[in-house]
């Protein structure tokens, strides 16, 4: 039996997509949450000096989207054909661009940096959020299935639904302009295995 181990900090963050794919697949895995104080000792042993990591029977893979793509292919949620897979990857890459664009806001909001949160919300987060959720809305509309690509769940649905859930928890009014993503989040998180994971995973602030 294949042994999967996901190593990340004790938060959701970039490690959550791997956990959710494995949970969706009903696959047992080792959820290795590394405390901040232990990270300096672990860091030199990682391929790129960062987390998350996926270990598959001892073989190590780094980078969250590489991990997500590998697991999605293993468990059949990477699109039903080569074109769908490419579309899924394009949305995933754009989602990463979105997170990079709004990163200054979230770094201050989460207490990892100092800055004017109100100004960052107005000048960085809201423009980035509206722009990129507008892009993603076009994919939802084009698919016409309630999913972002094709007619079944893919790993980008997990990515976007988790982020939407986090935004709703922080400020439900944020999604008033994009009600289709409230419906999308509810659809994705109604999956029995995902629902079980969300109910039983460790409670973390982000």
UniProtKB/Swiss-Prot annotation:
Gene3D superfamilies: 1.20.1050.10, Glutaredoxin. Its EC number is 2.5.1.18. It comes from the Eukaryota. Residues 2-79 form the GST N-terminal domain. Glutathione binds at residues 8, 39, 43, 49-51, 63-64. The keyword Transferase applies. InterPro entries: Glutathione-S-Trfase_C-like (IPR010987), Glutathione-S-Trfase_C_sf (IPR036282), Glutathione_S-Trfase (IPR040079), Glutathione_S-Trfase_N (IPR004045), GST_C (IPR004046), GST_superfamily (IPR050213), Thioredoxin-like_sf (IPR036249). Keywords: Transferase. It catalyses: RX + glutathione = an S-substituted glutathione + a halide anion + H(+). Residues 81-206 form the GST C-terminal domain. One of its GO terms (biological process) is glutathione metabolic process. CDD domains: GST_C_Sigma_like, GST_N_Sigma_like. The keyword Transferase applies. Conjugation of reduced glutathione to a wide number of exogenous and endogenous hydrophobic electrophiles. May play a role in the detoxification of reactive oxygen species produced during pathogenic bacterial infection. Belongs to the GST superfamily. Sigma family. This is Probable glutathione S-transferase 7. It comes from Caenorhabditis elegans.
